Structure formats: C-alpha cells, structure tokens
Amino acid sequence: MKYLTQIRLGCLPLLLCSFFLVNPVRSSASEALWKAASVSVVITPEENLWMAGYGGRTAPADGKIHDLWMKVLVIEARDGHRGVIVSTDTLGIPQSIYNNVCAALKKKYKLERSQIMLNSSHTHCGPVLRRALNDIYPLTPEHIKKISAYSEKLEQQLVDAVGKAIKELEPATLWAGTGFTSFAVNRRNNIESEVPGLRKAHDLKGPVDHSVPVLAVKDKDGQLKTLVFGYACHNTTLGIQKWCGDYAGFAQYDLEAMFPGVTAMFYMGCGADQNPLPRRTQELAESYGSRLAHAVADTVRLPMVELDPELKTEIEITDIKLADAPTKAELEKIAAGNPKSYVTRWGTRLLKELNAGETFITSYPFPVQVWQLGKTQLWITIGGEVVVDYSLGMKKEFGPNTWVAGYCNDVMAYTPSLRVLEEDVPPRKSSRWGYEGNTSMMVYGLPANRWSDEIEDKIVESARRQVKKVRNGK
C-alpha cells in the first residue's frame, strides 16, 4: 500500500488554504479553561562529550555557541486529563531513556505513556546519549561512562521539570494555527550544490512540507505564555564541534526575544529526507532560525483557532518486522574492513554477538501516538527519523487540522515510507538514494539492512485506529 506516495507538492498550499477557509476566526470555547505551565532547563553538558549526528567526527565537543535546552509543557483539560509535551535539543531520545522516563512519570505522577510526548529537535550539535549510535564513534569505556552519567542526569531533569510544571499549572487557553516557511529542500531529489540555482529557477524536486504548525498557550488574561511550533527539516545547518541547537535553537532564542517571558518550544516534524539548503555556516543557521521564528510570530499575530479544553490521548507500541539480518559470511567480510569505519565496528559487534550464540531481534516495538486537542485538532507522533510522506499523507487522510511529528518517544532508526524503501533497493536510479531506506540501519546499530515492507502499513493502520478512538471516544 502506497497511498502516502500519491501526495504531490501542489497539495500543501491547498491544505494550508483550507485550514484558514474552514477556520478563519477562533471558535467559541467553553467558559471552563485549560490549565497549563511550562518549564525550561539547561541541558548543556558540563564536560566535552562526544557529539551525536555525524559519523565523520573524530573528537568530542570543544565549546558552545549557545546553551542546549529541555523544555516541558504540561496541559490539563477540563476533566483533569493531562498531557506532557517535551522538547529537547538532542539528536534523538533512545528507547532506554524513553522507557525510564515513562516509568518514573507513571510512578510519581500517574501519567500513562499515552500522555507523554517526547520530541528531539535532531540537532547534530548535541551529545551522544546512552545506548544510541555507539558503533558510530570510537568510544572508550571512559567515554561510555560519561555518556551514561549525562543520560541519567537528563532523565532526572526531565522528571523534575514535569513535576515543577504540574505544581505551577494555572488557568489557560490554547490556540492553534499554521504558518509557512520554505527553506527545507528534499535532499533525495536535489544535489546540494545545485540547490541555489534550482531554487532561483523554481525547479526544486521532490515532496516537501513547508507548513509551520503552532500551538499557543495564553493565560486567563490573554497574555501569551508558551509557543510550541514544528517544522519538517533536518536540523543540520551546522557540523561544528560546539554545542548548538542549530536553526531550531536559534528560532527558539529569537521567539523568546520577540515575546519576552514566553517559553518557545520546537518539535521536529517529518523531516528525515529534508535538509536546510544551502548550509554549513552559522550565518545560515541563524537566518533559517529567524525565518522560522518570524513564521511563528506572524501566525500568532493573526487570528488563531481557540481549542476547547478537551484532551484525548492514545498510543500503540506496534511490532514492525526488520528485513533479513546479515549472514555470518557477510559480517565476516564487513568486520575485515577499515577499523576506523563505523560500518566495520557495526559488523564486528554483530559478528561477536553471533559467535557468542546471541539471537538477533527480528522486529522492533515501534511507537505511534495520537492526541486530539479540543474537538478537531489532531496531533500524531511517530518514532524514528520520519520521511515527509507520512506528514503529507496523514494530513490528506485525516484533514488539515492534523499535525504530524517525527523523532518522537524513541528514535531507533530512519522511518521510511514504502516509496523510499523501494527506491533504495539496489540498483538505484539516483546517487542520492540508499541511505534513508537502507544503509542508515547500520548507523543505528540494528541487525538488518532495512525495515520490512510492512512498515508503512503498520504505522498508518495504527494511526487510523487511534484517530478513530480519539474522534469517537472509547
């Protein structure tokens, strides 16, 4: 099933237009209010840990451009049902941290997994976390010890921040809107060096999602308190050795300067196959951040739709099969390669496990989550590095009042659509194809070269079941 692949570029402006045609002014909300509170915590490592995101790095971080942040927004509906939204300046939250945080929040605050939305900005200038990307870098036992200590501290900071936000809950109103900015480029269909010319000629190729979903939180007096906003584009303008939130970090800093006293929170959309192009300089990262911030600010200054104080939350952890594991002969060949290569480290580790009699996993417990805020606003989250097909397809199926976030709850691998999986099977028609649907699995350490072809169906079917529940009630 490839319904997601039928989306075309022309659909996005229609979706955005239909949003404002259907909802030109705010709806009439109940007199009862939401409750909400946000908390910000600096998570910049105190030590120069290894940085996550680029396999070519040869040393840990050596400074910072600006601080890294974790921000928490807790919302409470009229009936007392709560939702926790977490944004982090990290590459991706791994399963171990997600599971530990969920267990702690359930124990301390009786929050179920469905009520917790944990997003990573996917900055490539943040720290390596526990049990993530360990084959990519030449990590010593001392490095791993420091990474584990940082990860444990991060977990505690997150739990404490949620508790602080719960204590500070105050009456609030929630508002939804959508902006637009166009610096994201489909990296599978455009050669990076050619992008300036292609953009000038209006000839960029491939699906994109240039929408900027915005959730605004105001206090009972109408004062803006928190802005949550998303964008579907890799957070990879920079490749430096200094801590930085990249364009998403600059956007949050800009918004907090534009609106003093407001907490700005970024979430990554379905941007796994999208890049900010051109890139490679801090000036460009600041420029993209400014463009994104202004798209959010413009949205806030225009009429937005007020959301009734109703919240429904669902989640499913669905087993999705991996494709065939590499054979022992294949692993022996890989392990004999360049010892400095992460591919060699991946093959060596798997070969050692195989020789020790260990069994490789054949499927992965994959998170798909659906919230409904008010009577119509859907918010779907998908684990892994999610390609843009999912965002475009789900907005087409479920309606324009649908936000889709990738990089949520567990970033275990790339999350390709069936289209991308098929394009990435050798022989490939493009030199840009192959990574998202194939070789990236080695980066994340999984014992397979790709997901099975069922991945798109499994994710979409899970979303459909949950959308039906939140729309119709259990």
Question: What do the predicted segments below correspond to?
Answer:
Residues 1-14, 23-25:
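Bacterial N-terminal signal peptides that target proteins for export
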Residues 274-275:
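Catalytic histidine-centered segment of alpha/beta-hydrolase-like enzymes
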Residues 23-26, 303-306:
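N-terminal non-cleavable signal-anchor helices
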Residues 30-119, 123-263, 267-271, 280-287, ...:
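Conserved beta-alpha junction segments in alpha/beta enzyme cores
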Residues 292:
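Anionic-ligand-binding alpha/beta catalytic cores of soluble enzymes and soluble regulatory domains
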Residues 10-12, 17, 126-128:
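Alpha-helical and His/Cys-centered functional microenvironments
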